[in-house]
Amino acid sequence: METTLTLYVRYLAKPGCRESFLRQLTTEGIIDAIRREDGCLWYDYFLSVQNADEILLVEQWESEEKQQVHLRTAHMDRLRELKAQYVADARLGKVRLD
């Protein structure tokens, strides 16, 4: 059995930019494109009720290899551009499960 990979990414948006960032991801179809990728088991964003600029992304992949392919897609290139525009900081955590 392959090891699944779960990633937790804590984004801190630039002040007042959280909603704009999420709106761009949605209207440009980036979230839907990621969810349709081979190997993507789960991909969703959660909002902090305590910090108006904080976002938590949780994503799960069938394998680390499929997640690495995901990072090389055109929509991920666009996501990186949007992060440069709207995000002040991002912290990544990984969990591998057999």
Where are the regions a protein language model picked out?
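Glycine-rich beta-strand-turn "strand-cap" elements at beta-sheet edges
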Residues: 1-5, 41-53, 78-98
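N-terminal/domain-start segments enriched in small and hydrophobic, helix-friendly residues
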Residues: 2-8, 14, 23-27
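Short, well-ordered beta-strand segments in beta-rich or mixed alpha/beta enzyme
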Residues: 4-12, 42-71
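Generic structural motif
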Residues: 14-16, 97
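Short amphipathic alpha-helical segments
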Residues: 17-41, 75-78
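Short, flexible helix/strand-to-coil boundary loops that buttress conserved ligand/catalytic motifs
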Residues: 25, 70-71, 80-83
